[in-house]
Regions:
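Conserved NTP/Mg2+-binding pocket subregion across the NTase superfamily
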Residues: 2-110
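Conserved nucleotidyltransferase catalytic core and NTase-mimicking acidic/glycine-rich helix/loop elements
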Residues: 67-195
Length: 195
């Protein structure tokens, strides 16, 4: 009760062992965040459409004034083309091709033997990588859980060797240089984005 690590929420387990998150959000802030993404097409560094996904897939239990239901209906719209383009453009730059891009940061961290930094940068690389894939498929981002299986099962556009490269990445982390795997992943995602 009263957890505020990420958002103000109560986390409970019901008698039938179902876990439930009860989240308390300022509706105006929530709408402004979603509007910035969906209407203004402002990309994030990974997870761009998570809150939009959260809104349109939420099971509304209590909505005394109907505002959440109205907001949900307002944003049940087709995926904006400009948003798709902006997410892909922004996150591709983060993957590779710039001095601070993740591929360079990962390589530097590996070279200095900084495993904590490797772990952190790979997580950020994957956040941008999956953001691109969901945007390419015009799917709202479902959040951090089961991303690989959701992509494998539901995405029509995937990089070649999608599962193979992810499995290689995780199998090789902290045991060998993963820069080659990261490079292969970048090549394949650039191939399908044609950028």
């Amino acid at each position: 009760i009263g957890n505020s690590f990420w958002e103000l929420e109560d986390d409970v387990t019901l008698k039938d062992s179902i876990d439930m998150d009860i989240i308390y959000r300022n509706m105006q802030d929530f709408e402004d965040m979603i509007s910035s993404v969906v209407i203004d097409c402002v990309p994030w560094n990974g997870y761009t459409t998570c809150m939009w996904h959260n809104l349109i897939t939420a099971k509304i239990v209590i909505d005394k004034n109907g505002k959440l239901s109205a907001l949900q209906e307002k944003y049940r719209i087709p995926y904006p083309k400009k948003l798709k383009e902006n997410i892909i453009s922004n996150n591709l730059k983060l993957l590779s091709g710039m001095l601070p891009s993740f591929d360079m940061q990962i390589k530097k961290a590996e070279n200095r033997g900084d495993l904590v930094s490797v772990n952190h940068r790979v997580a950020e690389f994957l956040a941008s990588y999956f953001d691109i894939i969901f945007a390419l498929n015009e799917m709202t981002h479902p959040g951090e859980k089961r991303m690989q299986s959701i992509c494998s099962e539901e995405c029509k556009i995937l990089p070649n060797r999608f599962d193979e490269n992810l499995n290689r990445l995780f199998a090789g982390m902290f045991r060998e240089s993963i820069s080659d795997v990261i490079n292969d992943m970048i090549i394949e995602i650039k191939t399908i984005t044609k950028m």
